[in-house]
Amino acid sequence: MNENMSFKELYAIVRHRFVLILLITIGVTLIMGFVQFKVISPTYQASTQVLVHESDGEENSNLSDIQRNLQYSSTFQSIMKSTALMEEVKAELHLSESASSLKGKVVTSSENESEIINVAVQDHDPAKAAEIANTLVNKFEKEVDERMNVQGVHILSEAKASESPMIKPARLRNMVMAFGAAVMGGITLAFFLHFLDDTCKSARQLSERTGLPCLGSVPDVHKGRNRGIKHFGE
């Protein structure tokens, strides 16, 4: 078979296997849609913010206070995700999951040169995610006050279930990716089946394989078109 195929020949292969490509695309897309909407439970995220600012009380110590609090930012985030604090949240809300599982739902972050700590909790229940986030920051406020004598913890915003967006799964993106992958997979399979077929489908292919010139060809006479043809001896 000639390795240098023209665009017309490639298009003919795709057109010949168009039904197969279409069925694969529809099937994969429908399966992905079923998995996205019926199998995978949606995950929601509730967020809150905490400002940690401890001052010495002196008028000229504002800059040094901020620099010190920025250095303590990672420490505060570690305390917020500590097992002991997770156990307190678990007991407060009467949760059945383990402290390590609860810790995996909590994501803390802090922007550069900022004393604000962002706290996000992910859960399949938006109301539960907001409840965990609010309970966690309240426990954190008491924890740093008792253990570190830091009274500059301020909760800037409470997490609300009604504002919790669904972050997982990204249904539209996954559906588009499944559609594209199905189309590419169907086209790949169409070419694979074509190249596995060793039969000659044209006089040119036969001439290329044998190296002999083609002197003539016999047209394909369909059954419905040979009614008016009289055979020899009739």
From Swiss-Prot:
Q: Where does it localize?
A: Cell membrane
Record's InterPro entries?
Bact_polysacc_biosynth/exp, LPS_length_determ_N_term
Q: Which UniProt keywords apply?
A: Cell membrane, Membrane, Transmembrane, Transmembrane helix
Q: Which cysteines are joined by disulfide bonds?
A: none
Q: What parts of the sequence cross the membrane?
A: 20-40, 176-196
Q: Name one GO cellular component term.
A: plasma membrane
Keyword Nuclease belongs to the record: no
Q: Name one GO molecular function term.
A: protein tyrosine kinase activity
Q: Which domain of life is it from?
A: Bacteria
Asked if the record carries the keyword ATP-binding, the reply is no
Membrane topology per record: Multi-pass membrane protein
The record's comment on protein family reads: Belongs to the CpsC/CapA family.
Protein name, entry field:
Uncharacterized protein YveK
Q: Which organism is it from?
A: Bacillus subtilis (strain 168)
* Gene name of the encoded protein: yveK
